[in-house]
Amino acid sequence: KASVGFKAGVKEYKLTYYTPTYETKDTDILAAFRVTPQPGVPPEEAGAAVAAESSTGTWTTVWTDGLTSLDRYKGRCYHIEPVAGEENQFIAYVAYPLDLFEEGSVTNMFTSIVGNVFGFKALRALRLEDLRIPTAYVKTFQGPPHGIQVERDKLNKYGRPLLGCTIKPKLGLSAKNYGRAVYECLRGGLDFTKDDENVNSQPFMRWRDRFLFCAEAIFKSQSETGEIKGHYLNATAGTCEEMMKRAIFARELGVPIVMHDYLTGGFTANTSLAHYCRDNGLLLHIHRAMHAVIDRQKNHGIHFRVLAKALRMSGGDHIHAGTVVGKLEGERDITLGFVDLLRDDFIEKDRSRGLFFTQDWVSLPGVLPVASGGIHVWHMPALTEIFGDDSVLQFGGGTLGHPWGNAPGAVANRVALEACVQARNEGRDLASEGNEIIREASKWSPELAAACEVWKEIKFEFEAMDTL
């Protein structure tokens, strides 16, 4: 209200931005922040500061405030609760009016909500735990290029998880040797093989050579097995133009799927690639390289469930989501929380799984979670039980480390998977009978028996960092 007169000076954020009586709207974007204030800063002031600095506020009153309606545009901290078991930590809930965000831009959403506020001096640490994306905003995104059902129809594969394998050593192979490794894995029974996230176009293997040899491997293995095969050709590049050039070449080769590193490549590049993939019938596999830099600390950063939601909006058909049982981080309930966020249309709020809000995706296609990292045949029953049919299970070392080579390694994994799916369909309990199911299957498959022998004692047992 300009008529009241402009009063210069610094005033507390909580006078304007802490509104405990606010009723959230269906169109608001809601955020749950884990706030650790500096000593002496009350939680209401800290929560209000987060709301202010991530929306309309700045450190002092400015006369141009009178030229707009702050009540319409400001973020509001509407609820604060202490974190159980932690000293001086609070969950601050902030509501943002939808008008603050550009339609269809994950980039703009993150620039607003987490762009500036994390360096704020009044806070010791800050973590974005969850976002509620309103249906009105969801509808401005294309989302995944195809989604789970369309992918199954394209591949003609139903009723079981899909099997993949990352080609190792990740760096140093020539294109022809790389293509040979791909062929052996696909020929042995895998559905997919994968470029490692840091395989782009290096001196020892330029991207075009790799694409050609991998395409040859795909078509040769398809003709021999009668199954549709794919290799995640990594299109990630130094510029968006180069990335698109690689995706276009993949489409010209007639392969089914390409890949992108969405955090290092950036959301803008990722969304462009996702749009191209839908328009041209390519599936899009997403790797989350760099995620742990952002999500591993418990009290600072962004939780992966938020990055997973952002990916579903930006677009991708697969995304790596931890394993719960392998060598990489992932606590079971929390992991399953964001796995459901990726796959389901509607997910209820459930704090025991880290879900702070109910999320309605209104017909945005689902994303297949990918379990990858330090897993082998003995993990197959647990993975089948935990992730269910709509998932991709990726065994890199667990395929290529087989004593007889890549193709027998692929056979071992496929036999183990088929045995677990059959046992589950017959009503057996994979959690308690898993080892027995694998042992029974290995009697009929020398490849599986050899794999069981090699990896019988390997475990990666550490406490998960990410607890509720």
From Swiss-Prot:
Binding site for substrate: 116, 166, 170, 288, 320, 372
Catalytic activity: 2 (2R)-3-phosphoglycerate + 2 H(+) = D-ribulose 1,5-bisphosphate + CO2 + H2O; D-ribulose 1,5-bisphosphate + O2 = 2-phosphoglycolate + (2R)-3-phosphoglycerate + 2 H(+)
Site (Transition state stabilizer): 327
Family annotation (InterPro entries): RuBisCO (IPR033966), RuBisCo_large_chain_AS (IPR020878), RuBisCO_lsu_C (IPR000685), RuBisCO_lsu_C_sf (IPR036376), RuBisCO_lsu_fd_N (IPR017443), RuBisCO_lsu_N_sf (IPR036422), RuBisCO_lsuI (IPR020888)
Residues the entry annotates as binding Mg(2+): 194, 196-197
Cofactor, free-text remark: Binds 1 Mg(2+) ion per subunit.
Keyword match DNA repair: no
Any GO molecular function: magnesium ion binding
Record PTM N6,N6,N6-trimethyllysine, positions in chain: 7
PROSITE patterns assigned: RUBISCO_LARGE
GO terms of biological process kind: photorespiration; reductive pentose-phosphate cycle
Domain of life according to the entry: Eukaryota
Keyword Nucleotide-binding: no
Active site residues per record: 168 (proton acceptor), 287 (proton acceptor)
Residues that bear N6-carboxylysine: 194
Enzyme class (EC, first level): lyase
Remarks, miscellaneous: The basic functional RuBisCO is composed of a large chain homodimer in a 'head-to-tail' conformation. In form I RuBisCO this homodimer is arranged in a barrel-like tetramer with the small subunits forming a tetrameric 'cap' on each end of the 'barrel'.
Similarity comment: Belongs to the RuBisCO large chain family. Type I subfamily.
Binding partners and assembly: Heterohexadecamer of 8 large chains and 8 small chains; disulfide-linked. The disulfide link is formed within the large subunit homodimers.
Protein name, entry field: Ribulose bisphosphate carboxylase large chain
